[in-house]
A protein has these predicted regions:
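Detector for intrinsically disordered, low-structure N-terminal pre-sequences
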Residues: 1-3
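Generic low-complexity, intrinsically disordered sequence content enriched
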Residues: 11-13, 19, 23, 103, ...
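Interfacial loop/beta elements and low-complexity acidic/Ser/Thr-rich segments
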Residues: 32-512
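Short, Lys/Arg-enriched N-terminal segments with co-localized hydrophobic residues
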Residues: 5-35
C-alpha cells in the first residue's frame, strides 16, 4: 500500500538515476568536488622515557675530632642526604652528593656530660637508565631508610646508612589528531571553514589529562626565633631538628602558595653554669610563594617536597644577649601539573561527491581518575627495656613512614607499613641525663578509590602530620601519630584518530552497480550513520525520506534508501 505521494517521489528518484547513468555512462570517473584539507590538533603529553632505582649502603669510619672529648656511648644520631649534582650519560646517570650526619654522645672526660659531633660522607652513585642520553634532564628522589652510628672505640665511630635513589627522565610525546575537514582553498586563504559539497562528518569528544613537563625548584624556609623569657641564654647548640608538617599548596596564576608549620627542636648548653642543659620545642608558621610560569588555578598539582639539610645559628638580640635563633631549611620541590582536556575530534567522514579515504592511527593517553588524601591515626604503648635509664621528661619525638606492602584491590589500594619513632628524653640519672628510645608502630590502611583497576597506576606520598608522646609512668609512654597519605591515580584510555585523508574521483562503475533505491531492514548494532555511509546517501536524506525525527533506529525497522551523488 504505497501512497500516491510516495510513488511520485520514488518515480522522480528512479528517473534521476536513469538520466544520471545515461549521461555519464561512458566516463570512467566523476569528480566535481572541492579539494579538501584535514584540520589537525596536537595532543601533547609528557611520559616517562626511562627510569632506574638503586638501594645502596653509604658507610665510612670517622675519627672523633681532637677538639672533642672521648665518646662513652652514643645517645642519638641523625642523618640527611644532600644531592649536589646529577650527570647524564648514555644509558646511565651519576648522582653526586653527601651524607650529613650528627650525633649526641655522653662523655666522662669533660665537665659537661653531653657533647655533639658532626660530619659528612661524600658519595657518587651510578643508576642505569636505558635510553637515557646526555641531553636529558633527570629527576631524582631519595630516601634515607636507616642511619646507624656505632661506636668502634672512644675516638672512632662507624657510620652506615641505607639510601634509596629513584631517578626518571621524561619525554614529550605529541599525537596529531584530525578535528575537521574543510575546503583546502579556504584554508590557504585564511577564510572561514567551507564545507565541501557532499561531505558528511561525525565528531566525538575525547577526554585526556595533559601534563606539564616536570620541573624542580627550592623553597627556602627562613625565620628567626626568640627564646621565651623563661629560657636562659644560649652558649652552645648541641643538637637541633627542623621538620615541616601539614604542608599545603594552592595554585595561583603563575605561582604556588605554600603554607604549613615548621616543628623546631633545639638542645643547647646555656650560659648559666648552674644549668648544664636546656631545650626548646616550638613551631613556626610557613607561608610563602614560589613562582611557576606553567601553572594556573584550574590545574591539579603533584608536588613532592624533599627537606634538605638545614642550618641553625645563634645571634644576639637588641640587648646583646644570645637569644635569637636564625634558622634555614631548604625544601627541594619536584613539580608537575595536570589538566583535564576535552578535545573534539573527527570520528568518521565520507563523501557522496568523491572517494574519501581516511588514515587512522591508534593512540593511548592517560586520564586522571582521582586525587585523594587520607588521614591515618596510629598509636601504641612503648616500654623501654631494662637496660635503659628511666624516663623523667620527654624532650621530643621524630619519625618516618615506611610503606612495606601496597596492592591495588577492588575499589581501593591496600597499604601496610610502619612508623619508626625516635624519642629523646631526660633521664632520672644526673650522670647520664639524656636517653633515646626507638620504637616501631605497624599499621594497615585501605584507601578507597572507586573504579580503580590493577592496570591503573598511581603516585603515593606519605607524611607525618603530628606526633604526640606522653608519659604514662616512668617505665611506659604512649605514642600517637597522625599520618597523611595522598594518592593520584591515572587510568589508560585509547582511541583511533584520523591523521590523513586522501580524495579521488568517484568510481562510476561502482556507482552503476549500486541500486538507486533500496529497501533496508535494520539489524542489530546498526546506526543510521553506518547505513548511510554504506549505501551512498546521508542520514538527513534517510530521515526525510522515511519521516524520521531523529537518527535513532531499532532492529527490525524498515527503511527506504535513495542513492545520492553530489558534485556533478
Amino acid at each position: 500500500n504505497v501512497s500516491v505521494q510516495s510513488f511520485s517521489l520514488f518515480f522522480r528518484i528512479s528517473l534521476f538515476f536513469f538520466l544520471y547513468i545515461e549521461t555519464y555512462g561512458t566516463t570512467n570517473h566523476i569528480y566535481g568536488g572541492i579539494p579538501m584539507k584535514l584540520s589537525l590538533e596536537t595532543m601533547i603529553t609528557n611520559q616517562i622515557k626511562c627510569h632506574g632505582s638503586i638501594q645502596t649502603t653509604l658507610e665510612d669510619d670517622v675519627n672523633v675530632p681532637d677538639t672533642k672529648p672521648d665518646i662513652d656511648f652514643i645517645i642519638k644520631q641523625h642523618g640527611c642526604l644532600e644531592l649536589t649534582e646529577i650527570t647524564c650519560e648514555q644509558n646511565k646517570c651519576i648522582v653526586h652528593g653527601q651524607l650529613q650526619f650528627e650525633l649526641l654522645y655522653a662523655s666522662n672526660d669533660d665537665i659537661r656530660p653531653i657533647h655533639n659531633m658532626k660530619g659528612q660522607i661524600p658519595f657518587e652513585e651510578t643508576i642505569n637508565m636505558d635510553s637515557l642520553s646526555d641531553t636529558d634532564t633527570v629527576f631524582c628522589s631519595y630516601d634515607l631508610e636507616d642511619c646507624q652510628i656505632k661506636l668502634i672505640h672512644s675516638r672512632k665511630i662507624s657510620v652506615r646508612a641505607i639510601a634509596g635513589f629513584h631517578c626518571q627522565a621524561e619525554d614529550e610525546t605529541s599525537y596529531p589528531a584530525g578535528v575537521d575537514i574543510i575546503s583546502d582553498d579556504a584554508a590557504r586563504a585564511g577564510m572561514d571553514a567551507l564545507v565541501p559539497e557532499g561531505l558528511h562528518k561525525r565528531f566525538d569528544d575525547i577526554s585526556y589529562t595533559r601534563s606539564t613537563p616536570r620541573q624542580k625548584d627550592v623553597f627556602r624556609i627562613k625565620d628567626e626565633l626568640t627564646l621565651p623569657k623563661g629560657k636562659p641564654d644560649i652558649d652552645t647548640i648541641l643538637y637541633y631538628e627542623m621538620t615541616p608538617v601539614n604542608l599545603q599548596t594552592r595554585l595561583l596564576e603563575d605561582s604556588i602558595r605554600i603554607t604549613g608549620d615548621l616543628h623546631v627542636f633545639v638542645l643547647y648548653i646555656p650560659v648559666d653554669e648552674e644549668r648544664r642543659m636546656e631545650y626548646l620545642e616550638t613551631e613556626t608558621s610557613i607561608d610563602g610563594i614560589v613562582q611557576c610560569d606553567q601553572c594556573s588555578e584550574q590545574m591539579i598539582p603533584d608536588i613532592i617536597f624533599q627537606p634538605g639539610c638545614g642550618s641553625m645559628e645563634v645571634k644576639p638580640d637588641e640587648d646583646g644577649e644570645q637569644r635569637i635563633l636564625e634558622i634555614e631549611l631548604p625544601l627541594n620541590m619536584t613539580m608537575k601539573f595536570y589538566e583535564d582536556v576535552k578535545l573534539p575530534i573527527l570520528k568518521d567522514a565520507y563523501s557522496t561527491a568523491c572517494e574519501l579515504t581516511l588514515s587512522k592511527k591508534p593512540v593511548t593517553f592517560e586520564q586522571l581518575l582521582l586525587k585523594t588524601q587520607n588521614v591515618i591515626r596510629v598509636s601504641d604503648q612503648i616500654k623501654p627495656d631494662d637496660k635503659q635509664e628511666r624516663i623523667l621528661q620527654i624532650c621530643t619525638a621524630s619519625g618516618r613512614v615506611q610503606i612495606d606492602e601496597q596492592e591495588i584491590r577492588e575499589d581501593g589500594i591496600a597499604l601496610e607499613g610502619i612508623v619508626a619513632l625516635d624519642i629523646l628524653y631526660i633521664t632520672e640519672n644526673d650522670d647520664q641525663p639524656l636517653g633515646s628510645l626507638n620504637a616501631v608502630i605497624p599499621f594497615q590502611h585501605f584507601m578507597e578509590i572507586k573504579g580503580i583497576s590493577p592496570e591503573d597506576h598511581y603516585l603515593l606520598q606519605t607524611d607525618i602530620s603530628q606526633i604526640s608522646v606522653i608519659m604514662l609512668d616512668a617505665a611506659e609512654i604512649e605514642a600517637k601519630v597522625v599520618l597523611s597519605v595522598s594518592a593520584i591515580v591515572f587510568t589508560s584510555a585509547g582511541c583511533n584518530v584520523i591523521t590523513q585523508i586522501e580524495e579521488a574521483p568517484q568510481d562510476l562503475e561502482r556507482l552503476q552497480k549500486m541500486p538507486g533505491i533500496v529497501g533496508f531492514i535494520v539489524s542489530d548494532n546498526s546506526s543510521l550513520w553506518d547505513i548511510a555511509k554504506e549505501y551512498q546517501t546521508s542520514p538527513e536524506s534517510i530521515m526525510e525520506l522515511n519521516g524520521l525525527t531523529s537518527e535513532e533506529v531499532h532492529p527490525g525497522d524498515r527503511l527506504l534508501l535513495a542513492k545520492q551523488v553530489d558534485g556533478l
